[in-house]
């Protein structure tokens, strides 16, 4: 992967993105982002989770589309394939996932606006860097031969495996709550799929997906989002594992936090 594209604006934004990734990697060692089971309604301003997630993720679709469509190669085969993979991911993360969140009726909003703001910064950077890179092909690497390159093929396999694990794991968690009792607030231990091996298979799937994406696109923008994702999700996975073990006395002892049979 080459560092400089020769486009001053792009290279500057990429540098800023790497600096932000470093901040997330360090910050994640000391605190968890206040959403989900680690959310607090006592500090700061909070939004409805559906709205908060949607606002946080929407730049990944909108900003990506704007800058992708400005590129001269926007209708070339490889950029179109990469854009399709992108839209597959953010069709799920930015649109389907927020709409599918099951919120307890009458429960206070719990999605902290600071999480939304930080997330919007990430998805804006991410959308610009990838949308612009794909359709401008700054490094002249996206000829049709890229579709048979081992980096693309290997990365695609890893990406699809991770994406499948992510979607399946979120489906299992989403269906833990009894539809006949939507007001239930208690947490339950999920079983099946990746939960047989780790506490946070959705996080593992997300990490695998972005690792595969970085490989199949072979650009530094993909590496940035993998680092940011790791900085957020790796420590969160360990905190989640600890939370489950403390809350449920009969929690499966064979489960690891994030990587099957390892940690």
Question: What residue spans do the PLM features occupy?
Answer:
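Membrane-anchoring alpha-helices and their flanking helix-loop junctions
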Residues: 1-197, 204-263
């Amino acid at each position: 992967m080459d560092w400089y594209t020769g486009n001053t604006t792009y290279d500057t934004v990429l540098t800023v993105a790497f600096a932000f990734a470093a901040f997330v990697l360090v910050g994640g060692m000391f605190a968890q982002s206040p959403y989900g089971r680690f959310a607090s309604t006592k500090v700061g301003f909070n939004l409805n989770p559906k709205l908060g997630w949607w606002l946080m993720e929407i730049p990944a679709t909108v900003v990506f589309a704007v800058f992708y469509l400005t590129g001269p190669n926007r209708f070339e085969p490889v950029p179109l394939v990469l854009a399709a993979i992108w839209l597959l991911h953010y069709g799920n993360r930015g649109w389907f996932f927020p709409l599918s969140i099951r919120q307890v009726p009458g429960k206070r909003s719990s999605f902290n606006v600071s999480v939304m703001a930080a997330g919007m910064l990430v998805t804006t950077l991410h959308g610009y860097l990838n949308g612009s890179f794909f359709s401008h092909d700054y490094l002249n690497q996206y000829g049709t031969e890229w579709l048979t390159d081992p980096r693309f093929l290997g990365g695609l396999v890893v990406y699809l495996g991770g994406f499948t694990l992510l979607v399946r794991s979120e489906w299992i968690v989403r269906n833990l709550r009894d539809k006949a009792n939507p007001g239930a607030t208690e947490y339950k231990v999920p079983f099946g799929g990746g939960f047989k091996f780790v506490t946070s298979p959705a996080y593992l799937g997300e990490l695998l997906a972005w690792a595969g994406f970085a490989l199949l696109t072979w650009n530094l923008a993909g590496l940035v989002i993998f680092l940011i994702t790791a900085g957020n999700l790796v420590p969160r996975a360990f905190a989640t594992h600890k939370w489950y073990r403390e809350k449920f006395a009969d929690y499966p002892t064979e489960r690891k936090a994030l990587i099957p049979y390892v940690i």
